[in-house]
């Protein structure tokens, strides 16, 4: 039945084609019948699968395949059976025929399952009870396989497809041979046995046990259900599907270490599961054992999810589900028993300063808080802005990672910083002004205004300088007038020195040297006022008075020269004052 459920026609007991791993092996039952045609390989597969013929028909034999298909095979002569077997295979297989599945199901054949799962291999023996149940030696297939272990066979062979084939088979066997079922049931754990096949056997076991439990209920059909139940198994069957099929093809599960580990896992699973009537739940199957009629449609969402898990996940998480912290629950965002969704850290957005944690319902987030940058972040951003006012995307990503900020925050900070920079430098806001102030030529007018503003500021500075220089000149005029009245170049030199312009002291004599008349007057003044000069060398006023008194000679030429010199001196003073102002202004 399960074979049908499995989607295998009866004929294809061995729908092991997937199991063809065994193809290399000489088919136990050369598929003479069409049913076996693919199953040839499969059959042999079964040998390798072991669990095909062994598990189901010779479940043990096959099982042993895992451990040693041949042994299992021998278990049922089937293994040895030639093609004729194949043709009869159904009968044989199903027949008590040497199968008599007595074949030593007791042997690890059950391994058949184990073979499939590759779990039990050695432990099969240990499990044999389970497997046996599963495969149940008890059924000593005498059931007569006629009934057809076919179905068994199917299971067995198909089972491979479903991995727990062995287990399933055992169920089928059970189905056929309630006795077998009983064992499975006993596997309550029986399922455990069959389960052994599956998930590390345990799951499968439970499945079988489960079915066994059911199984007894289902009877033959149940058996098929069991296999079918590869749903139960299905985690096994589907999940383990490949691995089981691949007892040969998947070296990883077939390695000695892999088999030993699987065996250990199975032992643990069975030990833990057998005592509990609800192995399936403990194993993470969570099938409802109370539903005698539950078939594939009866699986809950979580059960379906469980089917998708890999054997390794099953092995590691079977016992964790009740705790609610199994990987599968996390990965599948399973709900807790309260129906509340668990929010794991990986489901949350990475925390970034100023960004919501994702703990609010969409649309209900509070107003975004103003992002508070740390001093370190601001320092780094200012450094970068100092060198580049505009960031490339690559550089922006680098800064975002180093400062633990989002790219968007970096981008906005730089936009704001550029606006601040333009404001500080009194530059036009190109972002908003560009659209309004574009000339017919497309040139932004603000750019044209820049020089005008600077020029205006320069003009203002020059005007201020001129005003200040004029004020200074007005203050200097009385002294200069005295110089003019004195008609003395010497006094001009004194005035210039009094104004703090030593550079111009030599200028007076140098300029006067070009004028012979002025030279004469200097000598005259010195001669005439020699007495006064000797007495009052440091008295400028006395000098001026003497000069005024002594120089009433009315030399117009000299007076003209003095005026010219005065104008030159004034221009020099103005320039000098401007230079000083420029320095102070800066």
UniProtKB/Swiss-Prot annotation:
Residues 366-425 bind DNA. Residues 126-135, 227-237, 245-255, 510-521 have a biased composition (Polar residues). Residues 90-150, 225-255, 309-331, 424-479, 492-565 are annotated as: Disordered. GO terms for molecular function: DNA binding; DNA-binding transcription factor activity, RNA polymerase II-specific; DNA-binding transcription factor binding; molecular adaptor activity; RNA polymerase II cis-regulatory region sequence-specific DNA binding; RNA polymerase II transcription regulatory region sequence-specific DNA binding; sequence-specific DNA binding. Keywords: Developmental protein, DNA-binding, Homeobox, Nucleus, Transcription, Transcription regulation. Gene3D superfamilies: Homeodomain-like. It is found in: Nucleus. Residues 318-331 have a biased composition (Acidic residues). Sequence-specific transcription factor which is part of a developmental regulatory system that provides cells with specific positional identities on the anterior-posterior axis. Homeotic protein controlling Drosophila head development. Transcriptional activator of the apoptotic activator protein rpr in cells at the maxillary/mandibular boundary. This is Homeotic protein deformed. It comes from Drosophila melanogaster (Fruit fly).
